[in-house]
Regions:
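A short core secondary-structure module
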Residues: 117, 121-161
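A glycine-rich, basic-preceded beta-loop-alpha segment at the flavin cofactor/substrate interface
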Residues: 157, 176-209, 226-243, 265-267, ...
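Glycine-rich phosphate/cofactor-binding loops in nucleotide/flavin-utilizing enzymes
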Residues: 309-390, 471-540
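C-terminal helix-coil-helix/basic helical segment that borders enzyme active sites and/or dimer interfaces
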Residues: 259-289, 301-310, 408, 429-473
Length: 541
């Protein structure tokens, strides 16, 4: 009625420390690994409770808890982390404003110095958990640089505004406004962190962005696969299971493909995070890939389940997830931004072995250093050209990246190229995990599909490069990709059977998702090979 979680649910979440998964045990938290956090959010999201999943994921992603652990002063940690762990305080973080969304650098919420105090005028919106938050992190510009502040809800002049209504999902989201006075003690991390807020945000966002929303996207894909596969096996039309119809097998194969990619890449990325990696390009890539693939899977599952998918009610498995996917696509870095700017456009400068040094040498007007790193850059290009001729696709990506740099400063504005290079990078990462799996038909089908996606991305890039660079990329691309692999109806039928018939793949998904109610009934029919039991009989229960 209030579009909110019930009081017993809130009580359960606080008592069982769902908001403290990332907080160390020493401060009363659970100290969970990235993999454990991912599994918890996946399980919740797979039940279709997207509002609950978002409520749990936000305090464990970018917010006061994560920032306090990395940058907070010892008094700040001692004061707030135990209260966040116990649920006594609910956190939120205010970054988005009226004129800044994906581009946080356009932030207009600013502070004026008044003696030893800061007079802050703020107008934040779209802030998850703001309506109920007790501890609020704020991104504010001080002397043109972003600084992070911590304030409590009852701070004089702070106004928690009305709630937003994000796609009708029951999670708290709203505005933060007001004119308030703050001291240096309110700076997260103390005075030494004044003006360093942007760096703090980028470093902390990398980990949470690779866990929370990808868990939601992966859950969406896996539930879509299990539900549509079980339904297609059970549902009969024209005297046969619809899963045996060629027209239905095509979307079923698409669903199986997206779920297979998401499930296996999630395992790979969580392993990287567990090893201490937190690269922003990798997290941006995985966020946009996992949520986009989850959306594709849900859309196709809605088509397969047809009337059963569009009638809302407690037995509808997909509707809530379907309606909420735009939330996953949008928050923590909109997918368009993540794909076209952040992954390759931002990642190339950070990851290239010579580019940063070359740019620094130009800016500092150091001729000797410039010539040295230019030589290294040329050597890097020639070396990867040679390796690419031996069908090394990682070398092909590195060589093509250097060819993109022939565009000069224009490469960062060439978002068409940048987005396709991001896709290629994504596919290389995903293939590195999938190629290591035991060989079976689903693995082979998935690699064929990824092969075709990668081939098309290279074709798009080479056409937009300067003439010589484009021809060189086309040459080594043809060595690596002789042709597009045809996906036949028989291939689709084989892939679809991985979710309509008993398989190790489905068994894996069943261990990762929540199975109850209507989905439980469908899975029971699937497991027991009960073709004769129609979906209408399941509905009647």
């Amino acid at each position: 009625e209030d579009n909110d979680l019930t009081k017993p649910v809130w009580k359960f979440l606080k008592e069982n420390k769902f908001f403290a998964m990332i907080i160390p045990v020493a401060y009363g938290g659970l100290g969970f690994s990235p993999s454990a956090q991912s599994k918890v959010v996946t399980k919740i999201a797979s039940a279709g409770h997207i509002g609950l999943a978002v409520t749990v994921m936000v305090p464990n992603s970018l917010g006061p808890g994560e920032l306090l652990m990395h940058y907070g002063t010892q008094p700040q940690r001692d004061k707030y982390l135990p209260k966040l762990s116990s649920g006594e305080m609910i956190p939120c973080f205010g970054l988005t404003g009226l004129y800044n969304g994906s581009d946080a650098t356009t932030l207009i919420d600013s502070a004026k110095t008044d003696g030893d105090e800061f007079v802050v005028t703020l107008n934040k919106r779209y802030i998850t958990l703001a309506p109920i938050a007790d501890l609020i992190g704020l991104a504010i510009k001080v002397d043109g640089k972003i600084t992070l502040f911590l304030v409590e809800r009852d701070h004089e002049g702070l106004e928690i505004g009305e709630r937003h209504n994000p796609m009708g999902q029951p999670f708290m989201n709203g505005t933060i406004k007001g004119t308030i006075r703050l001291t240096k003690d309110h700076i997260l991390g103390g005075e030494e962190q004044l003006g360093k807020g942007w760096q703090m945000l980028v470093e902390c966002l990398s980990v949470g962005r690779a866990i929370s929303l990808p868990a939601l996207g992966t859950a969406a894909a896996m539930v879509s696969a299990v539900a549509s596969g079980s339904y297609a096996r059970t549902r009969k039309q024209f005297g046969m299971s619809i899963g045996k119809m060629e027209g239905v097998q095509e979307p079923l194969a698409e669903i199986a493909y997206q779920a297979y990619v998401n499930m296996n890449t999630q395992h790979l990325i969580n392993g990287e995070l567990q090893a201490g990696e937190s690269p922003s390009a990798l997290s941006a890539m995985w966020k946009y890939q996992s949520t986009e693939r989850g959306r594709i899977a849900v859309n196709h599952a809605m088509d397969v389940m047809a009337g059963a998918a569009i009638q809302e009610g407690p037995n509808n498995i997909l509707a809530n997830t379907y309606k909420s996917m735009p939330i996953a696509i949008t928050v923590e870095g909109a997918n368009i931004l993540s794909r076209s700017l952040v992954t390759f456009g931002g990642g190339l400068m950070r990851s290239h072995p010579h580019l940063r040094n070359l740019v620094d040498a130009i800016q500092d007007e150091k001729t000797g250093s410039f010539l040295k790193h230019l030589g290294l850059m040329i050597g890097h290009t020639v070396s990867n050209f040679g390796k690419a001729l031996t069908r090394n696709r990682y070398a092909l990506f590195a060589f093509t990246s250097n060819m993109v740099l022939t565009l000069g400063a224009k490469y960062k504005r060439s978002e068409y190229i940048s987005s396709r290079m991001a896709d290629i990078f994504s596919i290389r990462v995903m293939c590195s995990g999938i190629e290591a799996l035991n060989q079976d038909d689903m693995r082979d089908y998935t690699l064929k599909r990824l092969h075709n996606e990668e081939l098309q991305a290279y074709k798009d890039v080479e056409k937009e490069l300067p003439l010589v660079a484009g021809l060189l990329v086309k040459l080594v691309r043809k060595v690596n990709f002789m042709r597009r692999i045809h996906i036949s109806p028989e291939d689709n039928a084989t892939a679809s059977r991985y979710i309509t018939e008993k398989s190790f793949f489905v068994n894996q998904m069943l261990t990762k998702i929540h199975v109850s109610g209507r989905l439980s009934e469908l899975v029971e029919c699937y497991i027991n090979n009960r073709h004769e039991q129609t979906v209408q009989e399941v509905d009647s229960k």
